[in-house]
Amino acid sequence: MYRGKRVKLEDETEGSWKSFAAVRMTAVDDISDSTEVVEMEDVPSQFFVEKHSWDGLRDIIHNSRMYSGMVINKAPHDFQFVQKHDESGPHSHRLYYLGMPYGSRENSLLYSEIPKKIRKEALLVLSWKQMLDHFQATPHHGVYSREEELLRERKRLGVFGITSYDYHAQSGLFLFQASNSLFYCRDGGHNGFIQAAPMKPMEIKTQCSGIRMDPKISPGDPSFIAFINNNDLWVTNIETAEERRLTFCHKGLNNVKEDPKSAGVATFVIQEEFDRFTGYWWSPAATEDADGGKTLQLLYEEVDESEVEIIHVPSPALEERKADVYRYPRTGSKNPQISLKLAEIRTDQQGKMISAQNKELVLPFTTLFPGVEYIARAGWTKDGKFAWAVLLDRSQQKLQLVLLPPALFIPVSVDDPQWEEHVEAMPEGVQPFIIYEEITDIWINVHDIFYPFIQTSNDKISFLWVNESQTGFCHLYRITSLLKPGCHQWSREYSPSEDDFKCSTEEEVALTSGEWEVLARHGSKIWVNEETKLVYFQGTKDTPLEHHLYVVSYESPGEIVRLTKPGFSHSCSVSQNFDMFISHYSNVSTPPCVHVYKLTGADSDPLHKEPEFWASMMEATGCRPDYIPPEIFSFPASSGFRLYGMLYKPHNLKPGKKHPTILFVYGGPQVQLVNNSYKGVKYLRLNTLASLGYAVVVIDGRGSCQRGLKFEGALKNKMGQVEIEDQVEGLQFVAEKYKFIDLSRVAIHGWSYGGFLSLMGLIHRPNIFKVAIAGAPVTVWMAYDTGYTERYMDVPENNQQGYEAGSVALHVDKLPNEPNRLLILHGFLDENVHFFHTNFLVSQLIRAGKPYQLQIYPNERHSIRCPESGEHYEIMLLYFLQQHL
């Protein structure tokens, strides 16, 4: 078939994709103007997706969801190895975990026995055993409290039932939240292991009204647990049922404006943008008193949000409460005032609480640490000698790792004479120590890796840490800092400079190096064997597309040994005595499986112990019949970086046909979409699109993670200005390589940052993107939160041009005038990217006379949770695409 390519085209109009598609115009009419010069070329014909009715699309979605419901969230996770010391018994470990047993719809606490010996010729699949007897963990009718609902949003939890647990190894105590209450049970520890029947968990009774959140066991005395109730810290003794409120910050008022304080609770920004979900930390040590009693300590964050803006989210769906009200600090506005405090509990010989006392820092937090805006992480050293905290300035370009001796906290004083009396009682030489500092001109990605060793002398401390700003890639270091005490005369007038507490570094040894990353964010862990001087960690040394478990010596670093098999991406957990590890792994064509490996070899050479397959926890389920895995591709971009992408080929690919194409995009920091892991569950809809005849392309451009700080930092101060070019370059590469891509019919679709980029694509490259489908988009950066926006864009007064260029609502004049090219979707109750963003965008669209379609989900937040809403969204997506692409 021949199609005319006109040599002379009309002037391009920026708002029309048709100018780009003009080279694919219909066949030249036999009576076309003889004066027009026409060149003839062989152009493939277009493939058109079959149009289904709404009900037909619902059936398609039902079928795909039915399969995903069989496999989603089935894999066990949150593993805890417990070694068995019964020499005559058949099992070496009991493995505890959370999982969803066959036929169940909710997560439960389970265990498996790991045998000492196996038959190598047979596949051993460990049985999943219920720990809890006939226990419903999900609240009645699935209704969560507001606090639980919001925490589930921050943690992106989609599962029901038990979603986390705390465990105390010596006593075998398990503690968890379920059914709007707290429960505990025991297995292992001093009491031995249950042998057969599941146990009935014990409910922890309370005098509190409202939900109890964030329960934790005291490591120093497992009779005591702490929890949060109504934004204050409480403690209870599960043996005596004695309960006590430790802090009195919150008044329990319905009026948010008049009740701004909390204790032990991570604020919205800290949870959402820094991945810290707690605000208190038990000391691992319990001090024995002379009379046989104990002193227990908790470090906690106290927050005052008096000056933080209040946001109202009205909704008819809320019925009994006409509006939801939140504290939400928009970029450039006031953040909460923060401090660290200490709660101290004294008990008698019988464990009865004698007293509880709150202590504050000898000087205000802002005086000791001027310029600090965020407490990103906190905790205790293993011996309880120091509390520690990771502190960030507002620009998030300066990080300080600080040690705080408990003696630095004094009883809360009512007046100056009392304060002076408490200061007089302080031991000599007590001060904070800034043991490490990082400074960058890009931003600091907060991580979860800090391993302090027990001090061998009082004047120094050694620890393992990761640093990204030093080389541009996240790597492990062994650091020794000198704790040089100063001669500080504590007084109300004393105004320390930060140099007063800054420690010099005696030694900083890189354990890893190169253009790859040690995984350190989003709950990543390391496992340190102090006996063999080895550290086990996860990273991307082999390829940025796969996560593997590695081991290296921290005493004499050199060779880095990979323990997991290549060709897959792994998520691992190492046993507490370093003889086993468990891996949840998959690749693009193999669904996840979970296997246990034993490290075998000579004890004289622990670095080179070989992983031996030991048992299976879960085998890969078969792919659904119509699942075709995506192909991973890469190309050298004009930016100088190699970019990676995925392509889902249309299932009914016809030779010589051009298929409509969907660019699925996220494109923002801290996310990597393209990797060698199974996509058949979370991204099942992309396979569904391919099964209908669409080509689907996914590209990780500059700004995405695990490629180094320079790669991610390309967005610095210019969000929305670089990402689309990488996406377009990738599309053009794919179209050149795979001839079935129809560049005249490209849709761009994403959610959250991907929704923002979908709008940006239609604004800046309307000649490339025929339609955009934008879910929950940020449309004006001035309305997003401090922690995220300022990290990447600075404060508005320092980057006015960047804020204006990156705010899509200010550029609606560049959107096309043709109808059916823009669909916006948003949950009305979204407390992260508020519906204000879509509201403001739509107002601007109306003012500019631009066409659009809007789909609101009245009962949804930032993530669509309700199955009916999720189904409607997917049908809406398919219907819009088949009608308008």
Swiss-Prot record:
Summary of the knockout phenotype: Knockout animals display a marked reduction in body size and a significantly shorter life span.
Entry EC number(s): 3.4.14.5
Subcellular location: Nucleus
Transmembrane segments: none
Keywords: Aminopeptidase, Hydrolase, Nucleus, Protease, Serine protease
Gene3D superfamilies on file: alpha/beta hydrolase (3.40.50.1820), Dipeptidylpeptidase IV, N-terminal domain (2.140.10.30)
GO-annotated cellular components: nucleus
Keyword Nucleus appears in the UniProt entry: yes
Root EC class: hydrolase
Residues reported to bind Val-boroPro: S752
Active site per UniProt: S752 (charge relay system), D830 (charge relay system), H862 (charge relay system)
Annotated GO MF terms: aminopeptidase activity; dipeptidyl-peptidase activity; serine-type peptidase activity
Reaction catalysis annotation: Release of an N-terminal dipeptide, Xaa-Yaa-|-Zaa-, from a polypeptide, preferentially when Yaa is Pro, provided Zaa is neither Pro nor hydroxyproline
One GO biological process term: regulation of inflammatory response
Annotated disulfide bonds: none
Key word Nucleus present: yes
Assembly: Homodimer. Forms a ternary complex with NLRP1, composed of a DPP9 homodimer, one full-length NLRP1 protein, and one cleaved C-terminus of NLRP1 (NACHT, LRR and PYD domains-containing protein 1, C-terminus).
Entry function: Dipeptidyl peptidase that cleaves off N-terminal dipeptides from proteins having a Pro or Ala residue at position 2. Acts as a key inhibitor of the NLRP1 inflammasome.
Record-stated family: Belongs to the peptidase S9B family. DPPIV subfamily.
Protein name: Dipeptidyl peptidase 9
Encoding gene, per UniProt annotation: dpp9
